[in-house]
Amino acid sequence: NKYGLKDKIQDGVILHCFDWKLSDIQAELPNIAKAGFTAVQTSPLHQKENAGSIWYMVYQPHDFIIGNGLGDEAALRSLCKEAHKYGVKIIVDVVANHTNGSLKNVSARLQDESLYHDYKGYCNDADRYSVTHGRIGMWDLKTEDPRVQKILSAYIQSLKACGVDGIRWDAIKHVGLPSENDSFIDNVVDQDMYNYGEILNTPGSSNPDKLFKEYTQYMSITDNTYGNDVTQAFAAGGTSKLKGNLVFRGIKGNKLVYWGESHDTYSNSGRDAWSKYVDQQFIDRSYAIMAGNNDATTLYY
């Protein structure tokens, strides 16, 4: 393509169009391509309960069917078709680990409690079982259940049919691996698409590097600690607390996704929203380092 964009998403950089309407993304495609972004990541597009503009409600699925306030199936098809003219790929954020905090706020087919794990505790990063079976404020889908897999697989294939090139798997560390007798990743993740999963800090076990490596057999993963550390080091004026990236722990660079800040570090509340108070120049410097890493891709928020 005339913009010099990469053929593979992992080889380029990604623009996170967080909570943008699909029509607005489409209107900005000329500028996005000129800026050098190989891919655009949308917010989740599944149905959600009517909760106004609260950003995190799109991370609490009502049903796994395309269409919410950001756009419907027709808008997604239009976006993908137009994006491909510029050489821009489309990634859609998908929430597969959980639904809502109340089953009253999900569709009838998702109100069956047998579709969810019956572990009553919350997740604890020191306990892997609780990470994959516990709740993070929402009902935790039984991802090893063929019924759940069928629903999610159909949703992924509907996105693919619209022209979507890749999937960002929200909270993937909370979804069990094949070695843990959960066949979700084997049966639902489409390896003909680009896939990367959100793993914040640790997958939660006494041997996290083993789990990191297993996830990367199926998809790229986020290395949030590295990006956050670099940004905070610039802001603090020193690098004494830098620990290095996951490459130093045996994870291949072509399986990593970096950022200088994320929608969570900016939009969350309290201490979790630290990056909104960091001067943009420091975030920009962090992004320069992230994007300069060989093999890894970088998500620009």
Segments (PLM) and residue ranges:
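Active-site-proximal helices and loops of the catalytic beta/alpha 8
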Residues: 1-13, 27-33, 37, 44-61, ...
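Aromatic- and acidic-residue-enriched carbohydrate-binding clefts of CAZyme catalytic domains
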Residues: 8-12, 48-81, 109-142
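Active-site mouth loops of central-metabolism enzymes
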Residues: 11-23, 138-151
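Active-site-adjacent substrate/metal-binding segments within catalytic domains
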Residues: 17-20, 24, 42-53, 68-70
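Glycine-rich, aromatic-flanked loop segments that form ligand/cofactor-binding clefts
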Residues: 37-45, 79-101, 105-124
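Alpha-helix N-cap and loop-to-helix initiation/capping positions
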Residues: 71, 147, 277-278
